[in-house]
Amino acid sequence: MVDEGDRAPDFELPGLRGSERGVYRLSDCAADGGVLLAFYPCDFSPLCKEKLCTLRDVEWFEFQPEFSVLGISQDSLYAHEEFIGRHDIPFPLLSDTDGRVTRSYDVQYDYWQRQPGLPRRAFFVLDESRTVRYRAVATEATEVPDLGPLLDAVRSLSTLDSD
């Protein structure tokens, strides 16, 4: 399990930002100013849509100028492309199709919606050195971690930078 204070496991996943495909390495994204990892089961479930659209509407850069948000699910890039187009998601959605990254963060369901290994809804706020500053993992499928503590954790990154 990856807890607060731990160094987050590095990874590299294919992803999509808008219609631009690329490969995203966590260490590269974090080095630019911290990262929010937002794990979620799938693009088109109603709760995931609500969660990702809520994240879309947050002004992340007012907290931390070079902050990155990365959405991670087991959906394909094709599903991500459709979802991004329908909901104007401005941050990259990454495809963890084999569940390797989900398992390395220990945020997978055993079974959900008759599918093994889908990601739970989870947030990890990482600083520039990939240290986990905040972690929230939903225990129930209908639970969405609270945004208030998440925003506080992101704000605290700018305090760490000024020390």
Residue ranges of predicted features:
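Chalcogenol-based redox active-site neighborhoods
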Residues: 1-163
